[in-house]
Amino acid sequence: MEIVYVYLKKRSEFGKQCNFSDRQAELNIDILPNPELAALYVERNPVDTGIQCSASMSEHEANTERFEMESCGVNHVEGGWPKDVNPQELEQTIRFRKKVEKDENYINAVMQLGSIMEHCIKQNNAIDIYEEYFDDEEAVEVTEEAPSAKTINVFRDPQEIKRTATHLSWHPDGNRKLAVAYSCLKFQRAPMSMNYDSYIWDLENPNRPEIALKPLSPLVTLEYNPKDSHVLLGGCYNGQIACWDTRKGSLVAELSTIEFSHRDPVYGTIWLQSKTGTECFSASTDGQVMWWDIRKISEPIEVVIMDISRKEQLENALGAISLEFESTLPTKFMVGTEQGIVISCNRKAKTQAEKIVCTFYGHHGPIYALQRNPFYPKNFLTVGDWTARIWSEDSRESSIMWTKYHMAYLSDGAWSPVRPAVFFTTKMDGTLDIWDLVFKQCDPALSLKVCDDPLFCLRVQDNGCLIACGSELGTTTLLEVSSSLSTLQRNEKNIASSIFERETRREKILEARHREMRLKEKGKVEGKEDDQKEEEAALDLDELVGKAEEEFFEVIFSELKRKEAEALKKKPKPRKKSSVKVEAEEEVEENVGEEEEAGGIIGIDAVEDMSEEAGEEQEDVPT
């Protein structure tokens, strides 16, 4: 602060005005030192000197401007979408536009403003102010930052008995809060005194949770409502669906009945993009997918059984352990099962059997993560056993890309929301792997040891800068990745698209080749079977010939006996057989026996001729 003091004096009191001029320096007086006084000089040693040890203090004042902070809301209506219209739904936006364009007020306003804006529109069309004149020149290469990540905060389970952080969910407005579900998924190993609470954490206060959610059973999943940030949806360990409203407190606001709920833990819950913002669906290891409306959550709206044989039998259903839904594909959803099979379903199908569209086989164990690429929905990521795989809906027999088999089991995975070629995976050894397909495809671009405990789940923030990882002991670690991993690179979309298309074409070629090989093997097997059938047919022919011979001789002897019986009936008196006839019959029987032993065939005419000759001889003999 400047201090000014004004001195007042009359001009007459100033005296005569000085007139200065430049001149050479001159010596006026020179006093020489006195030698006698110099001889009396004695140096004193030691000398006592006073010193001020304390710091010099002075009074200072500063006047600063104070900024007062307060929270306030603004209701912006003009130019925005209504609350019941989802901007991401193309059909809803088109329907709303058509409705507005038919309004008379809108037509009159456009007609009045058209003449005013016509001049400005012509100016904009005359010159392209956004034209880039040096776009063809090569850009100067800028050194990119190396991939890195650092720990920002750690949120620990406040309970004494530690539980697993099973699921994470970011606050939809600003991502200022993080909801964490805690549970013990080890079968029949949960302690009797284990607490069931789950928490909502403020990112700036890791010491104490902001809100505690108190369910009747431990929560396995927990999701924020994207349209109402005060509402949360949870899936319980006992199969029930619970709903909270943070404005009403920590207790459950809505709860499904046990009779109409799942029979096993609910591993997946997702909100649907509806007008009301109250519809959701869930999946469980009991093999059922259920649709709910939280306004009437006592029983589900619809149930689909995950029976890939399409017989709708619950005992044959595959247990669902992960769930995927993309808002741009409102009729489709995908389910990852315990058996390592991905089931693609269509909710709007007419029958229950038609709702299961196709299946993808690729993992040896449960599929813990399933997510579509946010830029290319036809490609989706699955994480299970020791690998992470990338699939295409056009190639169903095998995945188009996959990681190598790791030494540790993989527990979760997710795509980056800002970069189409980046995804994240967590492992049971506490490691977070960040994969960049543009930079490197065989190994992760960054592998970070987050903690010593096994990592169980992860969730990426919407802007891609922050990653939350939950461990088996309930510790949630918040990580911040470098700008190179959270910023869209130049031409990355085109590069990622070309990579996916190239691998899809390669898999289609391999599938066609394998199909041809299978057909050839099938033809060889069928040829061998035909040869075996011919050999068996030849053997069967000999057996049939022998059987035919036996049946033929049986018919002959039965016919002979019948004729003899008829001949005896025609004769009035029985006559004694002559020795000649007896000898003839014995000769016939001997000849027939010899023919049977030799394998020959005797005709009926030959037998009749022999019997006639025997009759003639009998007539010649006198009685």
Curated annotation (Swiss-Prot):
Top-level taxon of the source organism: Eukaryota
UniProt name for this protein: Dynein axonemal intermediate chain 2
Basic residues bias locations: 570-579
UniProt WD repeat ranges: 214-254, 261-302, 362-401, 405-445, 450-489
One cellular-component annotation, GO: axonemal dynein complex
Database matches in SUPFAM superfamilies: WD40 repeat-like
GO molecular function, one term: microtubule motor activity
Tissue distribution: Predominantly expressed in ovary, testis and lung.
Biological process annotations from GO: cilium assembly; cilium movement; determination of left/right symmetry; outer dynein arm assembly
Function: Part of the dynein complex of respiratory cilia.
Principal localisation: cytoplasm
Disordered as annotated region, ranges: 565-602
